[in-house]
């Protein structure tokens, strides 16, 4: 009886099997897409209280502290980093340096000096620095109070290898 029933509903059975195959295929594609998406920085809002600040130590001496808000890849970048740094008076996080990322610094408190591509500029709240890939740059606190700034670094999709 069962084989005859199967023969009578062959079209329905084929349709159900196709639907199951499509469903499994769709589910596996969605799973793969979710795994790929998880590698990228997700939309989010963070408060300073959510960020763990770490001490900046260079040549064995504490220079200030840094906290990273976001780090990872986005749809248009790789090595994307957003953070905040606080430098003690007279300190710099490290000497003038270069890196492959573009970078923006936004000063929110204190006084200092930025060296960008060979030019030194006095800075304070509201000062902004942009530097392209591999351009020499650095920042130093020249004031009597903590120098606070935010930074954003990234490598654009066009420069991906």
Where are the language model's segments positioned?
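A short, N-terminal "cap"/entry segment at the start of jelly-roll beta-barrel domains
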Residues: 24-79, 160-161
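Glycine- and acidic-residue-biased ligand/ion/polar-headgroup-sensing regions
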Residues: 100-112, 117
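Bacterial N-terminal signal peptides
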Residues: 15-23
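N-terminal secretory signal peptides that target proteins for export/translocation
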Residues: 1-8
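Ligand-binding loop in jelly-roll beta-barrel domains
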Residues: 77, 133-158
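Short acidic-glycine-tyrosine-enriched beta hairpin
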Residues: 119-133
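Conserved short histidine dyad/triad with adjacent acidic residue
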Residues: 66-71, 83-99
